[in-house]
Each structure stands twice: as C-alpha cells, then as structure tokens.
Amino acid sequence: MNTYAAYIDYALKKLDTFPVDMTGGNDNTVLLKDYQLFVAKVFLGLNSMNSILLFQETGVGKTITTVYMLKNLKKIYSEWTIIILVKKALIDDPWTHTILDYAPEVMKDCIIMNYDDQNFHNKFFTNIKSINVKSRIFIIIDECHNFISKSLTKEDNKKRNTKLVYNYIAKNLMQKNNKLICLSATPIVNDVREFQMLVNLLRPGILTPDKSLFYNKKLIDEKEIISKLGCICSYIVNNEASIFEDVENTTLFAKKTVHIKHVFMSKKQEELYLKARYLERKLGISVFKIYQRMASTFVFDDIPDKKKLTEEEYEKFVDSLSIDFKNTLYGKKISKQSLDILSAGGTINDIKDVKDIELYNYLYEHSCKFTFVCVSIIQSKGKCLVFEPFIRSSGIEILLQYFNVFGITYIEFSSRTKDIRSKSVSDFNKVDNTDGEITKVCVFSQSGNEGISFLSINDIFILDMTWNEASLKQIIGRAIRLNSHVNNPPERRYVNVYFVVAKLSSGRSSVDDILLDIIQSKSKEFSQLYKVFKHSSIEWIYSNYTDFQTVDDEKGFKKLISRNIILDENTITNKKKLTMGENIWYSFSSSLVSIHRGFKSMDNKIYDSEGFFITVLPDKPTIKIYEGKLIYILTVR
C-alpha cells in the first residue's frame, strides 16, 4: 500500500500550485475544502488514473469537487468532451446551475443526459459518434448506484439497455487517458453484485463477475481485495453509525436525533389493513407488500379486490373512493383555537370544540400516520420534511388534504410537480423562510430522495420504510448537509428524524416492523464491502502508509491498479472453536429498532447467533432494559 501512497504524493506535488477556489459568472466564488482539493489533485495529477469513485456522504460537496475538476481539465489536456449522466431531477439543479455559477466556460463542452430515459442508450451512442477523435472524454455518473442497478441483470433476465452503455464505458475507459468519476453516498444499495459491477466499471476486468465474494456471510480474502483496489475511491464518511443512531453536532453538521414513533391504527384502519394483507396473499403479490404498506399509511372506506375487477374498473373504483373522501373534507378546517392547543403540546383530549373533535377523529380513523404527522408539524419549531413514496390513492394526494385541514403550508416535490419543483425548493430554502413562516413543510416522494438539498430543516418524518438502509440514508441526507443549518440560531441546529411505525392493537408485527428487520439483516455483508472501500481509499492510504519512497513519474501506476483480484477461500477459517461465555441480547440501535440474540465471550468479544464476530465490548458498555431483558447497545466501526 506504500506504493499507492507514493503515487498519491507524486500527484499532489505535481499540482501543488492549483488554485484553492473557483470563480465563475457574476463573480460567484467558492473556496474549496482541503478534502475537495485533495481528491481533485490526485485524480487530475495522475494521467493514468482513469477512474475514481467519490464515496462521500451527502452534503459534503461532491458536485462542487467535480465541477472544480472540470474547470481545471484543460490545464491537463486541451481537448475534452464532458458527458454527465444523471437522474432527470438533477439536470438543472445541481449540475447545470453549479457549472454555470462556477465554470460557465466548460458548458459548451458538456453533454448532460438522463439515464432514466427509455431511449437513453440510443442517445448516448449518438452523442459518442459526434465526439471529435482528438478529444478525450470525461464521464461523470451521478448517483452511480442507480446507473449500476439499471445495468444489473435482474431475476426476469430481461435485457437492460443501460448495460450497453455500461459495457461501452468499461471497454473504452482506458483508451486515450479518458476519465470516469462516479458519485454516490450509498454505492451499494440492494445487492452484493452491485459492488462487483461498480468495481469492474472503475477497473475493467479486475474482479471475476460471477464468483462469490462471501462464504457464510464472511468476505473472502479481504486483504487481497483491498491490496488490489488501492486508490479506487475517495472516502468521506464522517458518520459511519447506523441511520438509527443519534449523532452529535459538529461545526459543519447539525445534530441528529432519531425517534421511532409507534402509532396505533384505528379500529377501522386495522380491519382494512388486515384485509389488505389477505388480498396480497390471495393475489400472490405479498413479496412487495404494496397493499399492506399503503393500508398502514391510509385507508379509504373499503379496499377493492383487484382480482375481481378489470384494471379500468379498479382504477375507477379507487378514484371514486378518493373523490368521496375529498368531498367529505371539502371546506373543513380545524379551528385556530384548537390548532393553538395542539401546537402548544396539547392532545385531542384538550380540545373543547365538538366539530373539531369529530373532524380529528374522522382523520385519525383513516390514517393514524397522517394525523400524527400533522400534529407534529404544527408543534415543530422550524421547517419539516415528509417522505411519502406513494403519490396517488393513499399517498401524497391524500396527505395534502390533511395539510389543508390543519392549515399547514407546503410544497410538493414529486413526479407530478416536475415543472415547478426546483423553483419551489429554491423558495423553500430562502433565508426569509428559515423558520418555515412562509412555507412550513416539503412533502417528497422518491423523486426527491437524491441530489436535492434542503436547508434549515428541524424535523423529518418518514412515513414508509424503504427496502434498504441506503435509501433511508439518502432521505435523511437531504436535510443534514454541510452548513445546511448555518442560518438557524445555535439552539435550532438540529434535525429530529421520526420513523413513523403503524402498530396493530394485537401487538403483532405490522409491515413497518417487518421492513425494519429486513433493513437490519441486509447490512451485514454491505458493511464489510464499505470497509473495503474505506481502506482502499486515497485518504486512508495517504494517512496510514507513510513509509514510501518518492517517485518521479507515474510509469508504474497503470500496472499497479490493473492487477486481477485472486480470491483464496482458504483465508476463511472455518474451524469450530469452543469459547466460554454467555448468551446475550444486543441491538445496534439505542432506540431498540431490532433486538438480536448473540454471545459474549469471557474476553468481551461479541458474536452473532451464527458465530460471526461483531465487535469488542467497551469497558463501560451501554445497556438498556426492555421487557425484562438486558440489551447491549453495540457500535460497530
């Protein structure tokens, strides 16, 4: 690893005189942080370093770092064509706006493309054919985990057109010293194969694609993988804790406090939720739990049986239910007197107005989550975000009816507001709306869980659990960003994160409980792969490997990073050992989101139920009591 460090040092010295800021149109100037300059100098300073992953948490300035590189490209070579592959929602903001603000002179060389476009692959190859043969290509893939997912062969074995673009980039990356930079705060989301595909995009052919990386959930030959992947990424993850862990504030980031809010369904909502569960099993679609997820959030007066209706009949039935519900609420609002009671911390039991009580109970009858969120929003001291992935039927469309009844001002960021959503977010983020006095809340769907920055947020409400921790991290990352709370007074530089979990009166697990457990179980393998990225990053190498001899050129770098990874399963020790200790309960969350069986050895080592080592218990461990059990709260680094 010292050899990698020598080449990093060479690149830094080569570009030592690079500017520390960049100025664009209208004298817009930004001063780069040291870590931003570090990665830019290393990547541009090594001509034969064709690729890098910016594995950096949300809000640290990945876009600014990349635009800085674009601004300084012609100091390396005179002719560049820049291809930026992004989600449609990110084309204008941040990419086009940031380039025009700080590097407008490179805009003429840029081709910005939406990889969600069904015709993306054809447009990509049309643009490739138009590039001058003398030009080098600088490719940027933002939120690269989405691009990788679209290139991955799924269980249906359908052809993925994005894979054609993936193959082209992997094949042509090494030619003419082209450059590829991938950006993501969560490079692995759903599948270990995403790691393999990403590595083979950055370092083509280095890793056998069909060979398993794990044996019994344990990474095979970790040292070999790290040694061959040196300098593959920049790793800036200041908070490696679980999304369910509280994090103290720093000078640059707001404090995060996590709350798991259990809200009991009304009798009516529970009955319809159980019907939704039955219909899912009857229709054979329970694997995605769509019916249950929707019913745990909101229910109409009935749930139609899709099996007995045509698609058109089903849509008409749902539309009629929606219209009936909206008509029932038309013109109705909770009085200011009752809102004042609730905003001061009161409950429904403190309200005296009979009509308000009836209206509140009607709303709660149909959605325990929406009602809880509305009350929480009016009690919040600042601005709020609400994540709701569903738009029609029981999603955002109905939630906004609740907002109207409670007098909550809002903007919506979803697929149905694409023409105005960027402007809406810009207004929402303005300094004169720091306290939410103009617009209190932004409700957003999956369209807004990546690439968008929200400023001065104090409360986030997550109404539906995604299938993985990475997506939840992206959602939370929209509000906790570098200097995102600089306009807040010191006492309000915090973000409360509420996971709103619908509960059944019987105490049985709801779909929200099930999804929380799924999220926890996926993280075991992913955490090992994230460790690989961390220990092969340019930051880790340059900080921890200082015993190197300086180099005068980069002749050997290409060969160093092109070595194949050869996995040896013998590096896994499978022999059973008898260890003395005791059975315990443990959780990775101080909120006790999920509790696991484990084993504590005499020397304070903690193992999971399958015998795999987790961590070493500190001298003064954190222990909580829950339902008569002693629960060890573990922190894994």
From Swiss-Prot:
Q: Where are the transmembrane segments?
A: none
Instruction: Specify the Helicase C-terminal domain's residue ranges.
Output: 358-537
Q: For ATP, which residues are the binding ones?
A: 56-63
| Substrates-to-products reaction catalysed | a ribonucleoside 5'-triphosphate + H2O = a ribonucleoside 5'-diphosphate + phosphate + H(+)
Named from the GO MF annotations, one term is:
DNA binding
Highest taxon above the source species: Viruses
User: GO cellular-component terms in the record?
Assistant: virion component
Compartment(s) where it occurs, according to its Swiss-Prot or TrEMBL record: Virion
Q: Where is this region: Binding to the cap-specific mRNA (nucleoside-2'-O-)-methyltransferase?
A: 459-526
Q: Give start and end of each Helicase ATP-binding domain.
A: 43-205
- Name the family the entry cites: Belongs to the helicase family. NPH I subfamily.
What task does this protein carry out? DNA-dependent ATPase required for providing the needed energy to achieve the termination of early transcripts. Acts in concert with the RAP94 subunit of the virion RNA polymerase and the capping enzyme/VTF to catalyze release of UUUUUNU-containing nascent RNA from the elongation complex. NPH-I must bind ssDNA in order to exhibit ATPase activity.
Q: What is this protein called?
A: Nucleoside triphosphatase I
Q: Which organism is it from?
A: Fowlpox virus (strain NVSL)
Taxonomic lineage is:
Viruses, Varidnaviria, Bamfordvirae, Nucleocytoviricota, Pokkesviricetes
